Amino acid sequence: MKKIFFIFILFHFILNKEYSSINDLPNQKSGFYEFDLNIPSNCKPLYFTDINNDKRMDIIVSCMTNSDSTITYYIYNSDKKIFSQNSTNNLILNNKEILSFIANDLNRDSYIDYVITYKDLTSNLIHSSIYIFNSNSNSFEEKYIIKNSDKNLFVADIGSDLGLKIIFYQDGKRKVLKFTELDIIIEDFSNYISSNTNICDGNNKYDNFPFTSPNSNSFVDMNGDCLNDLVISSYNPKTNKKYLEIWQGVFEDDKIKYCLSSHNIYELDNKLGLFTITDIDRNAMLDIVFPILNTNKILIAFNTLSISYTWTEDYCENHKPLTLTSSSKNSIQKIFDDFIIDLNNNDIFTVKLLYDDNYIFYNNEDEFPLYLRFLDINQDSYPDFLTIFYNKNTYQTYPIIFLSQKILYDSSFKGTQRRSFSKDFVYTFESYTNIKVATFFDFEDNGKMDLIFYDMKGKIRGLYNKNVYDSYTMKSILLFESNCFFCNEFGSTQRFITTNIDGTRRMDLSTQNVQNSLMGCLSLNYAYLGIGRSNNYIENFQIISGTLKTSSDNYKTYTPVIPNSQLIIYHTEAKEKKKINWKVDLVVEPTQKLPLLIASIIVMVSVMVLFATYLQMKERREDNIENKETFAPWFG
């Protein structure tokens, strides 16, 4: 019996041991190990995406030589665990300082294109150029220049014609640049807003304000109606007051339009930095988190809307967006309470992150603005965040990860439990000083978050996460072209249902590419879902485009889904342009463990069979001996 027990213990250890093809490396900190990424120290990270369609993230960088920038990409080699340069499609910018960078397939030809905002070093003017990749010449061609543009443009698939558009500010107006099969068209932003001025009473008051930053501008479903909304950070050029605008997506005249109600316009305190959108408390509604500048505090704005849902219904079928007509009298729901800072009160809204006030948020506004990066590092299904702090005494910067913790609220929340962050639940990286930007990466492509640091010396550094988490994960991506992994949609929503260990069911939410217009954001294309220790499958997984013409085409449901895997989903418009076709590929990860686990199971079963055979033979031998001893007196 002891031997059998030992075999089961050994088998359990084999199944739960964390295997890695990376050897133990020096510079361990909180279970993270640094290793060389093979990227030169004169290169700056610009963007993460999958260049070569191998289902792994690559990195686009800008390498400086004197006043010239060479934009190139490094392909991740998962076997060697390094990046290898692909120098065949370089783009050289002469006398240009890059301010903003976006990579995607803009003209829908399955080749990657760039939108680059830069300062011309000869004239100090800001322009934005669109570079389209020409597959015949195997090079990038500058197709359009937005002259004297604001640097804060962003990309979203607004409207009803299934195409990425560039939203920018120029000559006192918000404008939209869109691509057709033959040309590039510039439209006024007003073409995309609702004509119902009774309900949308803020449309004509704020639609021409400049943008504060593209990092905060987002295209995502804020009210849970399965249609994406525009979230815009703006300012009044006359008063310099900052605002948050939430333009709700609606159907009007068989088109998608955007409606700005006056009670979804929020004035922002100048002490608030660039906000991040995420679901803090995992109630399937998106919240907003602001860093408070020159402090170590954050402001959490919880979404006031809640999900009304029965587990047997189709969520999007029962949560449809508004359809407005000229006579519509519906009201637009208020999404947030006013954003009020109380720096002297560490309540659940204004959260002090560190004990020592000498540590404040690091904000390199000209190059890498302060931005909180949220992902679930410990896979407990709640988002944690990564940022950099500056020590006013030592003049050095340090990355820190803050883990989400459960907090009980007062009676104003009717006893509900929300999430916040604690000074005592952190990963610190004090040995990594003078870091400019820190962000998440997934080197092993297994849903477990690794890190990339970019330091003051211009070195891009990789940290491999060797912590072991006893939980499940899921990753998914929605593409608008088949097997084109840089053709990812912005702001796609993934809702999924699981059952907790205690038997209660819950709906969770994650989004892909919520905010990634400025290079300082450096976010991954996938939506990463930490499932925690729920049941071993996702009962209902619904992916929502948020941009398609009719609500019935807007989403697709899959059930059940295996965790520790990735869903690759794409939709195409049928030839008759009346129906959207969806396709899904399920990739079970991590594949590197599979052969070892299968071998372990075979060995374990073989050992158990041999051991059982041995016990059976031993028992027969003992029975024979006992029988001989029993019948010996009679048979001599």
Residue ranges and their predicted role:
Residues N16-G31, D68-T88, N124-K143, K173-S190, ...:
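Beta-propeller blade repeat segments, especially FG-GAP/WD-type strand-to-loop junctions
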Residues E34-L46, N90-I102, Y144-F154, S194-S218, ...:
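Repeat-based blade/solenoid architectures
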Residues Y47-N53, I102-R108, F154-D161, S218-G224, ...:
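Structural signature of eukaryotic scaffold interfaces centered on beta-propeller domains
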Residues N53-C63, R108-T117, S160-Y169, G224-S233, ...:
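Acidic/hydrophobic-patterned starts of short beta strands in beta-sheet-rich repeat architectures
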Residues N124, I130-Y131, S135-D281, I288-N294, ...:
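Solenoidal tandem-repeat scaffolds enriched in leucines and small polar residues
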Residues S411-T439, E444-G636:
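Gly/Ser/Thr/Pro-enriched helix-cap/hinge segments flanking short amphipathic alpha-helices
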